[in-house]
């Protein structure tokens, strides 16, 4: 049938997303990794937050997402609310809320741009970490990641993190 790709994720997780992409686009996919909003909040907090520069319009919408995520996690929202637009250090709640905004700017296109920005800022932040720090971070983060990557490949990828973190997200 004709459904959105995110429906495959909701109904069958990573394996169904992979099969859907392979069947519809004839693209082979060897491995996948996925995180949900809760995990992304924790991962961003684990790296110490990131720098973002949201507009006043964006923070109005982002704060609604902050409220929702805090309510679902039984956390006081006031500590995670944006108070103003502009360049600032943000925590996991604020960064995920920023990445979720779809009703400011050019709808979904700008939302995916914000998502790439958050991922790029995370990678930029981790670039200054040593291999030992990156390995410890991977140990903390990996339990939050759903994937089909075998242990041997994961260990190889962790060793290659300094190179991987230099890649540009497009």
State the predicted function of each range:
Residues 1-170:
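Non-catalytic, solvent-exposed segments at the cell envelope interface
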């Amino acid at each position: 049938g004709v459904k959105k790709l995110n429906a495959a994720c909701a109904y069958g997780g990573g394996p169904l997303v992979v099969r859907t992409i392979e069947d519809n686009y004839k693209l082979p996919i060897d491995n996948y990794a996925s995180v949900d909003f809760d995990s992304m909040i924790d991962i961003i907090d684990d790296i110490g937050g990131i720098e973002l520069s949201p507009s006043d319009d964006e923070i109005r919408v982002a704060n609604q997402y902050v409220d929702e995520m805090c309510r679902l996690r039984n956390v006081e929202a006031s500590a995670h609310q944006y108070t103003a637009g502009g360049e600032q250090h943000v925590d996991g709640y604020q960064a995920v809320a920023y990445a979720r905004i779809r009703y400011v700017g050019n709808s979904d296109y700008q939302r995916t741009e914000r998502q790439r920005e958050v991922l790029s800022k995370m990678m930029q932040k981790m670039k200054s970490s040593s291999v030992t720090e990156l390995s410890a971070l991977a140990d903390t983060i990996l339990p939050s990641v759903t994937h089909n990557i075998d242990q041997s490949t994961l260990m190889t990828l962790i060793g290659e993190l300094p190179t991987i973190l230099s890649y540009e997200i497009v």
